[in-house]
């Protein structure tokens, strides 16, 4: 009986150690997105580390300029900032995070912005990125990864 108890304690200790070594969940990625399956819409990059109780930290950048210009906002629309909170489901391959930073509209000026981003892991044709500028409010269509990769681990 003592051997069985010692074995159970050892298995639990190894499981806990393995979880601790795995570290916190991370969502990261970069590439180009599309809303129609073929035309570039944005260039994006992010890295987010998720903690407990909604805590998260990292950075987010999304640029629509040049070949990825957002109609009505030429020549530039850029959202960049620091991630302040979020949630992740590693098993489902999804994450959501919020943050604050800057909305840059080129000649129309810069302003403080709050943003929300929802992502789904995957490469071209599979990965998803949906940016919503919360303040000033500005919805952006959901994008599918055209080139690049979104990873959640």
Task: Please give the residue ranges for each predicted region.
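Cleaved targeting-peptide boundary
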Residues: 23-28
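Edge beta-strand at a domain terminus
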Residues: 81, 132-153
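Low-complexity, intrinsically disordered Gly/Pro/Thr-rich segments
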Residues: 45-46, 124-139
């Amino acid at each position: 009986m003592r051997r069985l108890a010692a074995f159970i304690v050892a298995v639990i200790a190894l499981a806990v150690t393995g979880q601790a070594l795995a570290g916190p969940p991370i969502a990261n990625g970069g590439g180009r997105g599309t809303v129609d399956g073929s035309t570039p819409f944005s260039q994006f990059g992010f890295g987010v580390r998720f903690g407990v109780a909604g805590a998260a930290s990292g950075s987010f950048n999304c640029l629509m300029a040049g070949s990825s210009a957002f109609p009505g906002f030429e020549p530039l629309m850029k959202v960049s900032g620091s991630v302040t909170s979020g949630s992740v489901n590693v098993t489902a391959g999804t994450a959501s995070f919020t943050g604050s930073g800057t909305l840059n509209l080129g000649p129309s000026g810069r302003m403080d912005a709050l943003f929300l981003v929802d992502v789904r892991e995957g490469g071209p044709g599979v990965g998803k990125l949906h940016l919503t500028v919360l303040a000033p409010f500005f919805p952006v269509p959901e994008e599918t990864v055209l080139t690049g990769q979104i990873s959640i681990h």
